[in-house]
Every structure is written in C-alpha cells, then in structure tokens.
Amino acid sequence: MGKSLSHLPLHSNKEDGYDGVTSTDNMRNGLVSSEVHNEDGRNGDVSQFPYVEFTGRDSVTCPTCQGTGRIPRGQENQLVALIPYSDQRLRPRRTKLYVMASVFVCLLLSGLAVFFLFPRSIEVKYIGVKSAYVSYDAEKRTIYLNITNTLNITNNNYYSVEVENITAQVQFSKTVIGKARLNNITNIGPLDMKQIDYTVPTVIAEEMSYMYDFCTLLSIKVHNIVLMMQVTVTTAYFGHSEQISQERYQYVDCGRNTTYQLAQSEYLNVLQPQQ
C-alpha cells in the first residue's frame, strides 16, 4: 500500500492546489462582487432617501461639521448634513458684545427721538400797535378805527408748526368794539420765528358817541385812548392743537392817522389792569 501511495502522480496534487487557488480567487471575487453590490445597494438606498443618518462603523465624517470628508458627485442635492449641537459655529463669538451694542443703539435712537419730538412751548409776544387809521361819520357821531397789530411767534420745537388761526378783539371801557379772525396763516419752521401783522376794524358809536367830541377836538394834539387788545393764536403740530392767549392795554390816537415805530418805547406804553 505504501508503495502504491508513493507513486501517485504529483499533478493531481498540483491540480488540487490550482483548484484551491481558483476556489479562493472565486471566493474573493464573490466577496468583492458582493461588496460592490452592497455599495450599489447603499447608493441606491441613499438616492431613494434624501435624508440619511449614518451611525456606527459605516458612518463617514460630515463634510460640513469641521471635517474633510467627501460625498459622491451628483448627490449634493440629495444628502443632508447633520451638524452636532456642540459645533462651535452654532455659538457665534462676541454675542454679548453684539447684544450690548444693539441695546445701546436702540437706547440712543429712542433718546434722540424723545429729544427731537418732545413738544416744546410756542411763544407768542404781542409787540404793539403798528398803525391806526381813523375815519368819522359826523351824522352818526361814529368813529371808525382800523388798528393793525404785530405779533412775534417763536417755534422752539425741532419740527414745523402750523399757525391755524388768529382771533383778536378790541375792548374800550369793557365794551367790545371790534373783532377779527384770520385763518390758515402760515407755517413756522423748526427753531424759527415769524412776525405777523393783523388788522382789527373797530367802531366807537351809540352809547360811546361822546368819544366823537373828544377825538375831533382841535385844541388837543394827541387824542390817546386806552384800548385792551386781546389775541388768541391757535397752532397745530402732529394733529395736536394748542391755543396761546395774550391781553395788553395799549394807547391809540383816535384823532388822526398814525403809524407807530415799534422800536420807540413811548408808543408801547402799556397800562396794567389793577389787581
């Protein structure tokens, strides 16, 4: 038996060896094909599911999470990157600085808005009588006086103010002898002042007809009478209306036409009412 075994052809062992090698190669090829098939299957799965979360040993580095990985070409619009909560880009630097700067800017803008839009006073100053033109009706013993007055209106605001109307009346001996009203006067710009003239026609007659003799008396050069000038100015801004009133006693010459120089104090002599 041993002899017969010793004379067995060697090529059979070689064939067996070749067969073993071939089978091993086939197995390797099968594994490679299986892996390729599995990769194709995974690629197909990825294409079917645009949002995929990779976990475990098969996971790859996220290209947008501080990594350097790559994704297959053509799948840029199919894959969704998962950014971890601990990613530093989710915690921007200088957040406190930006918040403080935003708060400071808001406070600054609010302060400026309050400063410029806060309503300030509108000053009305009665300057005096600018002119007085006199005419007479001898039959009715009536005196007609057209009195032109001057006002200075000052706007202390940082925005324009509209002067809606001026209402004026003149009293003599506690009797109203003339009224006037002017509408839609003018606009006064920010921190500006305008001088406005207005005329009040007055009539002295009836129970005060005795004044006709005084005003036409030739022996007197100056026929001054004391009149109380009342004026109310209505202004408007931002839909809000405000009224400013003034009362002044003023000398007016009823014996002739007179033009007053407002700079001269003698024509601005004012009698204050008794307290």
Swiss-Prot record:
Localisation per UniProt entry: Late endosome membrane; Lysosome membrane; Cell membrane
Ranges facing Lumenal side: 119-275
Name of the protein in its database record: Transmembrane protein 106B
SUPFAM superfamilies listed in its UniProt record: LEA14-like
UniProt record similarity statement: Belongs to the TMEM106 family.
Residues with lipidation of kind N-myristoyl glycine: G2
Role, per record: In neurons, involved in the transport of late endosomes/lysosomes. May be involved in dendrite morphogenesis and maintenance by regulating lysosomal trafficking. May act as a molecular brake for retrograde transport of late endosomes/lysosomes, possibly via its interaction with MAP6. In motoneurons, may mediate the axonal transport of lysosomes and axonal sorting at the initial segment.
High-level lineage: Eukaryota, Metazoa, Chordata, Craniata, Vertebrata
Description of the deletion phenotype: Knockout mice are born at the expected Mendelian ratio and young animals appear phenotypically normal. At 10 weeks of age, knockout mice develop proximal axonal swellings caused by drastically enlarged LAMP1-positive vacuoles (lysosomes/endosomes), increased retrograde axonal transport of lysosomes, and accumulation of lipofuscin and autophagosomes. Giant vacuoles specifically accumulate at the distal end and within the axon initial segment, but not in peripheral nerves or at axon terminals, resulting in an impaired facial-nerve-dependent motor performance.
